[in-house]
């Protein structure tokens, strides 16, 4: 979370899934922290553990710069339910079984796809959410994740 916004990366486009969801288009989303936690707890029925890292102002500036670099390589993408409601306001979420549609319905998160580069394709064993977090945090000089082998 940064400035009250959750940033997540995964294979959220069900239409692009291959290998049982292990591979697909890399999708980044941003959501309001409180709305996202509420969604996770009440929609997904998940217990949420929130961890933080204390960064200096200099490190935080580097993290923001890393995020800005990523943002130059993304383009807006809309989940199926969001597109449906734009075309017909009476669309029913019950007609959509993809996670990103439910997430958008519950949080109005903004979704993005990568235009090119290593995050364009999500792969559960390497190019995943942990790898993206490490990419961002490494800009601040942290060495939290060992990125050899399977990254989890």
Tell me the role of every PLM-derived stretch.
Residues 1-124, 152:
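Non-catalytic ligand/cofactor/substrate-binding and regulatory segments of enzyme domains
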Residues 119-151:
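Active-site nucleophilic cysteine motif
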């Amino acid at each position: 979370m940064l400035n009250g916004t959750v940033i997540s990366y995964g294979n959220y486009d069900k239409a692009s899934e291959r290998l049982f969801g292990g591979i697909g288009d890399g999708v980044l989303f941003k959501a309001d922290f409180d709305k996202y936690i509420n969604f996770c707890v009440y929609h997904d029925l998940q217990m949420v553990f929130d961890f933080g890292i204390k960064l200096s102002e200099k490190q935080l500036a580097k993290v923001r710069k890393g995020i800005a670099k990523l943002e130059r390589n993304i383009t807006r993408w809309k989940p199926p339910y969001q597109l449906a409601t734009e075309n017909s306001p009476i669309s029913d979420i019950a007609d959509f079984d993809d996670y990103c549609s439910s997430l958008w319905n519950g949080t109005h998160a903004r979704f993005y796809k990568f235009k090119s580069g290593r995050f364009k394709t999500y792969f559960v064993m390497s190019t995943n959410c942990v790898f993206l977090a490490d990419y961002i945090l490494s800009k601040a000089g942290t060495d939290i994740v060992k990125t050899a082998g399977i990254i989890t």
